A protein has these predicted regions:
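Phosphate-end processing signature that detects enzymes handling 5′-triphosphorylated RNA
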Residues: 1-190
Length: 190
């Protein structure tokens, strides 16, 4: 399924994360565990086109996503995977038709994608009037943990105002978060 994603992201300190967690009373909220496996081919074609290919395992579902970065919004091609698909594969010799079609539409030729990173995120969400507030605690492959605030919205202009207000109200300096895959690659070099 093709979706448009409009989100704003900010890295947090552990204390800022804890403060927001308490302020929005997330202690008793559902905790979503995301296990993300990121893939690229030998020529780094996904990175080259500003895209990421991942398989995400959560408490409720498994899906493959092709995420294509845009200036103010991202495009996501999400394909549910069932138990017939290999669990935590290190290579993806066969991609779902929806993802192949999007790559062909973009005129991108991909070799067999190989596993490049694996991360795990503990996620809490709360719906606010202006959008969805998401707090992520992410553990990367070398046991580095970071904290992130995401704010997902349906409208860019409304979202940017609400996100900046959220940061200001909570005395959080702007510290834009790179995508998790980019942070994973950076952390792997430490």
């Amino acid at each position: 399924m093709r979706e448009i994603e409009i989100e704003f992201k900010n890295l947090l300190t552990k204390d800022q994360y804890a403060s927001l967690f308490e302020k929005y009373n997330l202690k008793n909220s559902e905790k979503i565990i995301n296990k993300n496996f990121y893939y690229d081919d030998a020529d780094e074609n996904f990175k080259r086109i500003g895209a990421a290919l991942r398989i995400r395992y959560t408490n409720k579902k498994t899906e493959m996503t092709l995420k294509i970065k845009g200036e103010t919004q991202n495009i996501e091609i999400n394909v549910p995977l069932d138990e017939r698909y290999p669990k935590e594969p290190t290579a993806l010799p066969i991609l779902p038709n929806e993802i192949i079609a999007e790559l062909e539409r973009m005129n991108v030729k991909i070799k067999t994608p190989m596993l490049i990173q694996k991360i795990e995120t503990l996620r809490c969400e709360i719906a606010l009037e202006e959008g969805l507030l998401v707090l992520d605690e992410t553990t990367f492959i070398n046991d580095i943990i970071d904290y992130e605030l995401e704010f997902e919205t349906k409208d860019y202009e409304t979202g940017v105002v609400a996100f900046e207000k959220l940061l200001e109200e909570n005395n959080i300096d702007k510290n834009p978060a790179k995508p998790k895959i980019a942070r994973a690659v950076e952390y792997s070099k430490l």
